[in-house]
A protein has these predicted regions:
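Alpha-helix initiation/capping motif
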Residues: 2, 69, 82, 140-142, ...
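Context-gated lysine
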Residues: 2-6, 39, 48, 59, ...
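N-terminal export/targeting and maturation segments
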Residues: 21-95
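Extracytoplasmic electrostatic interaction patches
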Residues: 91-170
Length: 170
């Protein structure tokens, strides 16, 4: 009888593993992000994404790439704008040295983040609702263009990256 119970438990364990392992593989291999491309800020403002994310774009913005994360409601947005229309430095706060490591770990293609790693300056930006964003900005070979990457930050991430006197903790 003990052998039967032991054999039954082993069989049940094997059957459970056969069922749950493929389920776990499917669950973790599924991309939990969505990518959208917009040519202009107006195109973004008229999209379904606008209701969830902020309008941070200067009027001359173009080539807008938006990656949204389903699970965390986070976002990464990359765009370019005319240098004459860039976001004023008075709205950006210099970031701590940990910012490059954070930027390196972003879940976006290396080809999109490498120029920001190589040439970008990092800042914190706070939208009108005090939502914190990591901003990387660089100037391209074209002297009239500036490139931006905005990434939403959770409060604990902002505390580790942004100057402490700029972060609201509520």
């Amino acid at each position: 009888m003990k052998k039967f119970i032991k054999l039954s438990l082993i069989s049940l364990g094997i059957i459970s593993a056969i069922i749950f392992i493929p389920f776990l593989i499917l669950m973790f291999s599924y991309d939990q992000h969505a990518d959208d491309y917009y040519k202009t800020p107006d195109e973004f403002l008229n999209s379904k994404s606008f209701s969830w994310y902020i309008d941070i774009f200067p009027k001359s913005s173009r080539n807008i790439f938006l990656r949204t994360f389903v699970e965390t409601n986070g976002m990464i947005v990359i765009f370019e704008a005319n240098k004459a229309d860039e976001i004023p430095l008075s709205q950006l706060y210099p970031i701590t040295s940990k910012g490059i490591d954070y930027l390196s770990d972003f879940n976006i293609p290396a080809s999109q983040k490498q120029p920001f790693l190589d040439n970008g300056k990092l800042y914190c930006y706070f939208y009108s609702n005090n939502s914190p964003y990591l901003v990387s900005k660089y100037y391209s070979n074209n002297p009239d263009l500036v490139h931006y990457m905005f990434t939403s930050l959770r409060s604990e991430e902002a505390l580790g990256l942004c100057p402490s006197n700029t972060v609201k903790t509520h």
